């Protein structure tokens, strides 16, 4: 990090912001046990908004699911991106 970027501030990239949000969600879920995943619709809407900045997609093109098996939780995101 340079002194100039420190003084002027540097805008975070959307990928790092999304990563931080996902880490917070996962940490919250792990701390609270097996609470219902009521954040999934909001997560799906946010993903559509972010990806729509770069590629034309609709709400139906993204599927988000959370699977639990014993002590393992898997957040799965499937995105259909149209061909150019």
Curated annotation (Swiss-Prot):
One BP annotation, GO: cell division
**Which gene specifies this protein's sequence?**
minE
Query: By its UniProt entry, which HAMAP family does this protein fall under?
Result: MinE (MF_00262)
Q: Name one Pfam family in it.
A: MinE
Q: Per its record, how is this protein called by name?
A: Cell division topological specificity factor
Q: What does this protein do?
A: Prevents the cell division inhibition by proteins MinC and MinD at internal division sites while permitting inhibition at polar sites. This ensures cell division at the proper site by restricting the formation of a division septum at the midpoint of the long axis of the cell.
InterPro entries, per the entry: MinE, MinE_sf
The protein's organism comes out as: Paraburkholderia xenovorans (strain LB400)
Q: Which family does it belong to?
A: Belongs to the MinE family.
Give the UniProt keywords, A-Z.
Answer: Cell cycle, Cell division
């Amino acid at each position: 990090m340079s002194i100039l970027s420190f003084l002027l501030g540097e805008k975070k990239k959307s990928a790092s912001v999304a990563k931080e949000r996902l880490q917070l969600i996962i940490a919250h879920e792990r701390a609270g046990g097996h609470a219902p995943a009521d954040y999934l619709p909001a997560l799906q809407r946010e993903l559509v908004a972010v990806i729509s900045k770069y590629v034309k997609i609709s709400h139906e093109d993204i599927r988000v699911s959370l699977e639990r098996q014993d002590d393992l939780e898997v957040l799965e995101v499937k995105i259909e991106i149209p061909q150019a």
